[in-house]
Amino acid sequence: MSATSKSTTRTYIAIDLKSFYASVECVERGLDPLTTNLVVADKERTEKTICLAVSPSLKAHGIPGRARLFEVVQRLREINEERRKAAGKDFTGKSYSVKELEQHPDWEIDYVTALPRMSHYIRHSAKIYNIYLRYIAPEDIHVYSIDEVFIDATSYLSSYQMTAHELAIKMIREVLSETGITATAGIGTNMYLCKVAMDIVAKHIPADKDGVRIAELDEESYRRKLWDHRPLTDFWRVGGGIAQRLSMYGIDTMGKIARCSIHQEELLYKLFGINAELLIDHAWGWEPCTMELVKAYRPENCSMSSGQVLQEAYTYRKARVVVQEMADAIALDLVEKRCVADQLVLSVGYDRESLTTPTGREYTGPVSFDRYGRKVPKRAHGSINLHRYTSSSRLIGEAILRVYDDITDKRLLIRRLSISTNHVISEDLLKQKTAKPIELDMFTDYEEVKRKKQLEDAELARERNMQETILKIKHRFGKNSLLRGLNFDEGATAKERNKQIGGHKA
């Protein structure tokens, strides 16, 4: 039974495991996660591959948590050049240990590269979640991501006769003792404040001997400490687009958003519509959403999506194979979840090298800029209505290829693909939906319409039986135990992606 209280004043704790993937890999190697230079990345790919994580000691050198591997190499090359000049001689050794590098200024900074192991990280995350469950009921824990949770600690503080800080540190110490992984925590009077305390305030306070940082905020201290904080993108749910639109009106802090909500509230609603309400609440440190509401939430409509960044630039024909594979996979996913959808959306992202090829130079369409300011042909987007709810691989595959052929510029090279299924509902809900009335006319042969529908339904039933058989085989013998001829075509990626979780090695 949940210990959730009905009192108005609540206490929330957010806990974020520090550089989780990198910390797991350090601990597995008997290394200190806080003093070891380590990146989690598949170096078998190109240096453009995204690092799944970097250790805290590398972050201290200005390397972002989701850097590309070449950015790590480039930054360390710059730092090592500075170290070599300071030493006044060539390096006499190298190390990935911060402690050793401090003792030997004439050594080169090195780092460990760990291959991603997603299934291993998931097991570690589950183990840590079970540690939280020793203290908190599952109804009062919201798993935000593989390495982050929200906890409604309101009713547990009196039971344990602890402050929120004491309860947080007790759980974090237990996680550290059993896994070797440390954490950062935020405490607040609502879910927004505990998140911001963790993300912003905790980063600016000294860590204890185990690297633990815990910060606390209420509405008053939030306004006092963070109303003038910059940049706005440090705040939860404020992305670059929102910050950019606000900056056009001279608004670059939460304090200015709060003041604007008093005198020019209509401006915020003009810019962001209904989302302005959330932005205004957060500017004042308010958050009406409780743990109880989070747990009770069920979306009326949902979607399923699949996306991938290709390992190299693909031609139109090669990428078409991948689109077919993705459509087949998403249809099987719908069958497995006993769901159906009636709309598909396709997004095609082009490679920047497209503009340098002989055919690409002919391109005169719209361009955008990547994160490095380089010109890239603008993404292509398209959607199609299926005119019926379905999980058929055939119907979904045929429809998405029509969209692909229609929206894709055949002259350009392709780097990114994503497919979304919209208006996803359960098969049970579909059965409850009443059939729409048909407007009869004198020129339609309804017997022929009925006959065609019966034939199509029979064909779809046969396909459904085949899909369920495929799923049973894959569940028992592995995803690659049954492959289509398509999966062996040039450019096919399904066989390799079946060995991955979230685009990284399982």
Sequence positions of predicted segments:
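C-terminal hydrophobic structural anchor segments
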Residues: 402, 406-465, 471-472
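Short aromatic/hydrophobic contact patches that present stacked aromatics
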Residues: 150, 385, 418
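DNA-contacting surface of Y-family translesion DNA polymerases
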Residues: 14, 234, 240, 244-414, ...
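Short, charged/polar surface micro-motifs in flexible loops or helix N-caps
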Residues: 20, 44-48, 350-355, 424-428
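Short, well-ordered secondary-structure micro-motifs
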Residues: 196-197, 356-359, 429-432
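A glycine-rich phosphate-binding loop feature that marks nucleotide/adenosyl-phosphate handling sites
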Residues: 189-192, 281-284, 340-352, 413-426, ...
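Gly/Gly-Pro- and Ser/Thr-rich, intrinsically disordered tail segments characteristic of DNA damage-repair
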Residues: 1-282, 287-291, 442, 447-506
